[in-house]
Amino acid sequence: MNSKCHCVKLNDGHFIPVLGFGTAMPSELPKSKAKEVTKIAIDAGFHHFDSAFVYNTEDHVGEAIREKIANGTTRREDIFYTSKLWCTSLHPELVRSSLECSLKKLQLDYVDLYLIHFPMALKPGDENFPVDEHGKLLFDTVDLCATWEAMEKCKDAGLAKSIGVSNFNRRQLEKILNKPGLKYKPVCNQVECHLYLNQMKLLDFCKTNGIILVAYGVLGTQRYNGWVDQNSPVLLNEPVLSSMAKKYNQTPALIALRHQLQRGIVVLNTSLKEERIKENMKLSPEDMKVLDDLNRNLRYIAGGIFEGHPNFPFLDEY
């Protein structure tokens, strides 16, 4: 399987490719690298690109997409582009202007999917991570239902084909789903999900409510300093994964990706080495169970800088 023709239907009728390419760049690389890897990814068969305002790569990603459209490699309607609303713009009056800012950087007319990046508001302003004189993040309070109504207006205006959320727990999803006058349900919830954090209960809840789970960090995340505990285990070194890779004559990464896809999850990948997942390769139910049992509720991106925020999502069971 590659991402060319494999999609799942969202609850608003649009389709999302099951395999996406992440465009966040490690801090040690220049942001301009995003243009290069996006062009390579398009050539490799990717159609689904995941980005965000806070990644500071949207101008480069947009340039890559436009160049590939201009030379006939792809068409805009064959690209599925996701952007995300950052925490400093959760006030409803800031939502549309933030999306328009992303569109201006991209030089595109619309995004295919627009997500609330985190359910935690930060003080609005020019800084993505505003802090006080002691270096502590400046939290803000916003009604997520009001933010969601502004997201719905972006969809109605044609600026986003679909709208969803990211890093929401069950309680926060329920708040949106139970909102009086809800016009559009979130089409997805993008969360960290991998063999060590399989999100079984959250996945079941999302499926029950027609919400697709989109997984980042499927291979254990890039080990960003400041965000990821450098002492945490390396997922791809898991012995069970290694032995299963030998059994199926695949790489450990492809086994990890296939496991999530067979669970009905849309997966984001940042490695161009793993862009092709053999269509005829399927894990047996017994092996799926073995991989399910590797769960240890280990969160690589624990969001520690947000701890203490009233909307911090990772204290609930799911």
Swiss-Prot record:
Question: Where does this polypeptide localize?
Answer: Cytoplasm
Q: Listed GO molecular functions?
A: 17-beta-hydroxysteroid dehydrogenase (NADP+) activity; 5-alpha-androstane-3-beta,17-beta-diol dehydrogenase (NADP+) activity; aldose reductase (NADPH) activity; androsterone dehydrogenase [NAD(P)+] activity; bile acid binding; carboxylic acid binding; ketosteroid monooxygenase activity; lithocholic acid binding
Signal sequence annotation: none
What keywords is this UniProt entry annotated with?
Answer: Cytoplasm, Lipid metabolism, NADP, Oxidoreductase, Steroid metabolism
Any Gene Ontology CC annotation: cytosol
**Database matches in Gene3D superfamilies:** NADP-dependent oxidoreductase domain
Q: What class of enzyme is it?
A: oxidoreductase
Q: Which residues are marked as site: Lowers pKa of active site Tyr? A: 84
A Pfam family annotated for this chain is Aldo_ket_red
Question: Could you say which residues bind substrate here?
Answer: 31, 117
The entry marks the following residues as binding NADP(+), namely: 20-24, 50, 166-167, 190, 216-224, 270-280
**Reactions the enzyme catalyzes:** androsterone + NADP(+) = 5alpha-androstan-3,17-dione + NADPH + H(+); androsterone + NAD(+) = 5alpha-androstan-3,17-dione + NADH + H(+)
The Gene Ontology biological process annotation of the record reads: cellular response to jasmonic acid stimulus; cellular response to prostaglandin D stimulus; daunorubicin metabolic process; digestion; doxorubicin metabolic process; epithelial cell differentiation; G protein-coupled receptor signaling pathway; positive regulation of cell population proliferation
Q: Which domain of life is it from?
A: Eukaryota
- Read off the InterPro entries from this record: AKR, AKR1C, Aldo/ket_reductase_CS, NADP_OxRdtase_dom, NADP_OxRdtase_dom_sf
What is this enzyme's EC? 1.1.1.-, 1.1.1.209
Active site: residue positions: 55
Functional description taken from the UniProt entry: NADP-dependent 17-alpha-hydroxysteroid dehydrogenase that converts 5-alpha-androstane-3,17-dione into androsterone. Has lower 3-alpha-hydroxysteroid dehydrogenase activity. Has broad substrate specificity and acts on various 17-alpha-hydroxysteroids, 17-ketosteroids, 3-alpha hydroxysteroids and 3-ketosteroids. Reduction of keto groups is strictly stereoselective. Reduction of 17-ketosteroids yields only 17-alpha-hydroxysteroids. Likewise, reduction of 3-ketosteroids yields only 3-alpha-hydroxysteroids.
Instruction: Describe the family membership recorded for this protein in Swiss-Prot or TrEMBL.
Output: Belongs to the aldo/keto reductase family.
Subunit structure, as described in the record: Monomer.
| Name of the protein | Aldo-keto reductase family 1 member C21
